[in-house]
Amino acid sequence: MALLSRRLLAFFVLLSCVSTAIVAQTPPTTRPATRTAAADPNSGPSDVAAPKMGARGQIDAGFNAAHLKFIARGKAGPIGVLFLGDSITQFWTRAQAVFDAHYAKYQPANFGISGDKTQHVLWRIDNGELDGIHPRVVVLLIGTNNFRDPEEAIYRGDKKIIDEIHQKLPDSKLIIMGIFPRGDGRTNALLDSRYPDGPHIIDGRVKLQAVNTQLAKLDDGGKTRYLDIWDKLLDSNGMLTTDIMADYLHPTTKGYEIWADAMQPMLDQMMAPWPATATTTAPAN
């Protein structure tokens, strides 16, 4: 009897060891969560219309409010010159005296939204911002917020916007602004993988200039014009200065004066004859 008990005990000990080994070698069905970077909700294709999204997956409230405001502005009265773009356009409000001095006579409207990429402007166009309006001239400046996209993608986004403007506003003329320089040199470093000997660190402004080279080819000398003020915004050493762009991205009042002065001859020519046959007092922005 004692012998049988010892044998049973040995059997159960062996069975326990085997079970433990099996469990140890079997991967758990639930693995520990791994940390991943949160996906940018606004990193979609530059030429596919998309609203600006908030962090919680909803349309950004400020973006939507501005969009609805612009639609209401279009219904409020005639627009002679329409400015369309991102924060650089929106922040004409920081140089309102310059804006009014140059454009008040042309019944202007400012449809700029801070942070907009090309895909966001496409969504705005597709959702009614250009419906029912007939501006004499549209001034388009967009693309700097697509800074980290490939240059070909930035151009495709701009080109699609340009095509849609012409489709929606067949009688309007268009001034395509070249994307402005940005950064102090150190903040523009990008990893470019196109080199055969491996990735190179490049100045991202080179990419923006390549986009501008493509945009310039769309100038037909008549209905569609291209204006590049890149060099006018830089000093003699090819650098941005804080009196022109305090944050190396958004123009100061002096920067907006440079833009306005450079564009005025082209705009006056494209707006002529002015005033239009039917004019109605309307809000400037």
Please report, for each region that a protein language model flagged, where it lies by residue.
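N-terminal secretory targeting modules
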Residues: 1-17, 21-84, 88-101, 269-285
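Acidic/histidine-rich helix-loop elements
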Residues: 45-58, 110-120, 148, 248
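Extracellular/periplasmic catalytic domains that process cell-envelope and extracellular macromolecules
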Residues: 74-78, 101-104, 131-134, 167-169, ...
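Extracytoplasmic/secreted proteins, especially bacterial periplasmic and envelope-associated proteins
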Residues: 79, 83, 116, 120, ...
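Structural recognition of the beta-strand scaffold that forms the well-ordered cores
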Residues: 80-85, 107-112, 136-142, 173-178, ...
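Short, glycine/acidic-enriched loop or turn micro-motifs at the edges of active sites
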Residues: 89, 115, 231
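Oxyanion-hole/transition-state-stabilizing segment in secreted/luminal serine hydrolases
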Residues: 90-104, 118-171, 175-190, 194-196
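Catalytic His-Asp segment of secreted/periplasmic serine-dependent ester chemistry enzymes
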Residues: 183-285
